[in-house]
A protein has these predicted regions:
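C-terminal target-recognition/interaction regions appended to catalytic cores
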Residues: 209-330
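Short beta-strand element of Class I
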Residues: 32-34
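S-adenosyl-L-methionine
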Residues: 44-67
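Conserved beta-strand elements of the Class I
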Residues: 11-13
Length: 330
């Protein structure tokens, strides 16, 4: 697919930006005006890959009025429980309450206050699949109600990236528009990805598990096997998709191990992790292996985001305030 230059790009902001996966997915269609990320190592990777970007830190200390106007808000926010004590007491007294009461003290509150102040045309929020069931489903219900209370029409879908990258990775995506647009999440085309196609041909010895680590993993798996459960390391199928890459991968790489025949298995390299998340090889990795494993384990799958971005922006052409977007040659 060839992408022509954007004539009049929409604008977006990137909250809880991590290393810029959401931005990477949206950049073909628009311009990022503002970025916020607290972790200093993620900031380093972000700035290395988006030259000229000024990444601000703690979003809780940034006044909403200081954030530039934008068309779309992007955020991969942390999953936190909401305290319902104050809400329950207000209900018992017959007092009205809104998102400020329900979400106070969480980072989701900062998303809400920015949406309230800036009123962008749309937003995309990303989180782990378990957000839907977190805290007996209370967390998710409050999130959706808060977004609707702010005047948005909300769409939700869990998407598994395993059709376009060789990794089983389910994430929940929440899309909202200020207008009742006919939005549908994209159906990902199954490209039959295979793990072997993202593996490097030459890998440094340091990625091979030491005898002590490998023996410990085997003992751990044996113990769980004797108890009748399937916990333990996973030897990845090179002809299929891997397990989900997590931020804990830096510990021992147990969830995705690569068979090396007679040698001990190895963990993925940082570059392989980047590929597993759909980042191009041009994406720079300036931090240590430990930090890079954490960063890619917390990242979004870029091609999934790009498909959602394409669907969102095309849908927004239907609205009252149309946005000029890229023309496509398939």
């Amino acid at each position: 697919m060839y992408m022509k230059k954007v004539k009049t790009p929409f604008t977006f902001i990137d909250l809880f930006a991590g290393i810029g996966g959401l931005r990477k997915g949206f950049e073909p269609y628009g311009e990022c005006l503002f970025s916020s990320e607290l972790n200093k190592y993620s900031q380093e990777t972000y700035c290395e890959n988006f030259p000229g970007s000024s990444v601000l830190g703690d979003i809780t200390k940034i006044d909403s009025k200081e954030i530039p106007d934008h068309d779309i808000l992007l955020a991969g926010f942390p999953c936190q429980p909401f305290s319902l004590a104050g809400v329950s007491s207000r209900e018992s007294l017959g007092q009205k309450h809104g998102f400020k009461d329900k979400t106070q003290g969480t980072l989701f509150f900062d998303i809400c206050r920015i949406l309230e102040q800036k009123q962008p045309k749309a937003f995309l929020l990303e989180n782990v699949k378990n957000l839907q069931t977190h805290d007996k489903k209370k967390t998710f219900k409050i999130i959706i109600r808060a977004l609707e209370e702010l005047g948005y029409y909300v769409n939700v879908k869990i998407i598994d990236a395993g059709k376009i990258v060789p990794q089983h990775r389910e994430r929940i995506f929440i899309v909202g528009f200020r207008e009742p647009l006919d939005f549908e999440f994209p159906e990902l085309k199954d490209t039959k990805p295979q793990l072997k196609n993202i593996l490097e041909k030459r890998v440094a010895k340091k990625y091979t598990l030491l005898d002590g680590t490998w023996n410990a993993l085997k003992r751990h798996k044996k113990r769980h096997g004797e108890k009748g459960n399937g916990f333990g390391y996973n030897m990845a199928n090179k002809n299929g998709v891997s397990n989900t890459l997590s931020a804990r991968y830096c510990k021992d790489g147990a969830e995705i191990l690569i068979d090396q025949g007679e040698k001990n298995p190895r963990r993925l390299t940082p570059r392989e992790c980047a590929r597993l998340m759909g980042f191009p090889d041009s994406f720079k990795i300036p931090v240590s292996d430990t930090q890079s494993y954490r960063q890619f384990g917390n990242a979004v799958v870029v091609p999934v985001v790009q498909e959602i971005a394409k669907a969102m922006v095309k849908c927004m052409q239907q609205g009252k305030h149309r946005i000029m977007i890229t023309d496509y040659d398939e």
